[in-house]
C-alpha cells in the first residue's frame, strides 16, 4: 500500500513510519516541522519520501500529492493547552482547516482508508471510568475543541461522502521520541530532563491523579491493524485501559519530588474503555508501564538536550491557564 502520514516527523508519526516501512509499505511523510523533527526520520530517510508542507494552506498541492495513495493517517496538528488558550486561531487553522484540507484531498482521490488522530481530551472531566466512546463530549480548552471539531469533520465526510474514515481518540502516549517541549502533557519529557539535570521531579497537584498511559509501540500496532481492518465510520478509544498515578511514574523514574498547585480543568482520573477496539480489531496492549519506563531510562540520553522545566518556569508558563480556566470566581 502507498501510505501518507501527516505529521510523520513527530513523536507518534515517526514511530508509525517505522511500522509501515517494516511491513513493506510505501510511505510519504507530510510535515511542516513546526513541532516534528527530521532527525526522527534519519534512519528511514532512504526508504521514504518527505514533503515539507503546511496543510492549512497548500490545498491545490495536496490534491496532486494524494494521487494514487491508498491509506491516509492524519496525525498532524498542534497540541498543548496553554498555547491554544493564548492563540486559539492558530489552533483552528492547524487542527480544523488543516483537517478539512486533508479530507478534501483524500475524498478527491478515493482513499481506501482514512485514519484520524483524535484526542481523549474531548471528554473533559468524565463522569464514568473507564470512559467509553459514547461518553459526553465536554471540551475544556481550544486544543480539545479543535481536535474534536476535526473528528466531527472526519465523521461527517464519512457519512456524506461515504469515505472510509475512522477516528482514534488517543489517551496519554509515551515512548521513544516523545516530545520534550511544553509544560503540559509531556510528563515523561519533563521528568526525564529533570532527572538528567539532577533536579527534583515536578509534580502538578498531589500526584494521586491517574492517567491512562499507552506505549507508542502498542499505539502504532493498533493504528496499523485499524488500517488493515478498515472499520469505516467508527470511533475508538486508544489507551491501555489501566490507570497509573503520576506519583507512580515519578517512583519508576526515581529521584526527589516537588509538588506545585493543581491546574484547573484537568481531570483527577483518566482511563480508557478499550473494549470496543479490542473486540473489533483483535488488538491488545502488550507493554506494561514498568517495562515501558525501563526502556526510556535505558535511553535517557535521548533527553539530554530537552529543555529543563523548573517549578518556577512551569508556573509562569501556565499563568494564562489559571487566569482563564480557574472557575472559582464563577461560583
Predicted regions span which residues?
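Glycine/proline-rich active-site loop of Rossmann-fold NAD(P)-dependent oxidoreductases
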Residues: 148, 173-189, 197-208, 216-217, ...
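Hydrophobic "lid"/C-terminal helical patch
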Residues: 16, 223-227, 250-253, 274, ...
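Mid/C-terminal beta-alpha module of Rossmann-like enzyme folds, strongest
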Residues: 229-264, 273-274
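Conserved C-terminal active-site "lid" loop/helix of NAD(P)H-dependent oxidoreductases
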Residues: 216, 248, 263-295, 303-309
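N-terminal Rossmann-like NAD(P)+-binding domain of SDR-like oxidoreductases, especially those catalyzing
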Residues: 1-173, 217, 299, 303, ...
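A short C-terminal helix-loop "cap" of Rossmann-like NAD(P)-dependent dehydrogenase/epimerase domains
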Residues: 134, 189-203, 229, 255-261, ...
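Residue-level signal for the nucleotide or nucleotide-sugar donor/cofactor binding architecture
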Residues: 36, 57, 86, 94-97, ...
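Glycine-rich Rossmann NAD(P)(H)-binding loop
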Residues: 6, 173-177, 203-213, 236-244, ...
Amino acid at each position: 500500500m502507498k501510505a501518507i502520514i501527516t505529521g510523520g516527523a513527530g513523536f507518534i508519526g515517526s514511530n508509525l513510519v517505522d511500522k509501515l516501512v517494516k511491513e513493506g509499505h510505501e510511505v510519504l511523510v507530510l510535515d511542516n516541522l513546526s513541532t516534528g523533527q527530521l532527525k526522527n526520520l534519519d534512519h528511514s530517510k532512504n526508504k521514504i519520501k518527505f514533503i515539507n508542507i503546511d496543510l492549512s494552506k497548500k490545498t491545490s498541492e495536496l490534491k496532486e500529492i494524494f494521487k494514487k495513495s491508498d491509506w491516509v493517517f492524519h496525525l498532524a496538528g498542534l497540541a498543548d493547552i496553554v498555547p491554544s488558550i493564548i492563540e486559539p486561531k492558530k489552533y483552528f487553522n492547524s487542527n480544523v482547516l488543516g483537517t478539512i484540507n486533508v479530507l478534501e484531498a483524500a475524498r478527491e482521490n478515493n482513499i481506501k482508508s482514512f485514519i484520524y488522530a483524535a484526542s481523549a481530551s474531548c471528554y473533559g472531566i468524565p463522569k464514568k471510568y473507564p470512559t467509553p466512546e459514547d461518553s459526553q463530549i465536554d471540551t475544556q480548552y481550544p486544543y480539545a475543541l479543535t481536535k474534536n471539531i476535526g473528528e466531527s469533520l472526519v465523521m461527517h465526510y464519512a457519512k456524506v461522502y461515504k469515505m472510509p474514515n475512522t477516528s482514534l481518540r488517543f489517551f496519554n502516549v509515551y515512548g521513544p521520541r516523545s516530545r520534550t517541549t511544553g509544560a503540559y502533557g509531556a510528563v515523561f519529557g519533563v521528568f526525564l530532563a529533570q532527572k538528567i539535570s539532577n533536579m527534583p521531579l515536578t509534580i502538578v497537584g498531589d500526584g494521586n491523579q491517574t492517567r491512562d498511559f499507552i506505549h507508542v509501540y502498542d499505539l502504532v500496532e493498533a493504528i496499523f491493524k485499524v488500517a488493515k481492518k478498515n472499520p469505516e465510520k467508527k470511533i475508538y478509544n486508544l489507551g491501555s485501559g489501566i490507570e497509573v498515578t503520576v506519583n507512580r511514574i515519578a517512583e519508576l523514574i526515581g529521584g526527589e519530588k516537588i509538588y506545585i498547585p493543581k491546574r484547573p480543568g484537568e481531570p483527577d482520573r483518566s482511563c480508557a474503555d478499550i473494549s470496543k477496539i479490542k473486540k473489533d480489531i483483535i488488538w491488545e496492549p502488550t507493554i506494561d508501564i514498568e517495562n515501558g519506563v525501563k526502556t526510556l531510562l535505558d535511553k535517557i540520553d535521548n533527553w539530554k538536550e530537552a529543555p529543563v522545566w523548573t517549578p518556577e518556569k512551569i508556573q509562569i508558563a501556565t499563568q494564562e491557564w489559571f487566569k482563564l480556566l480557574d472557575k472559582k470566581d464563577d461560583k
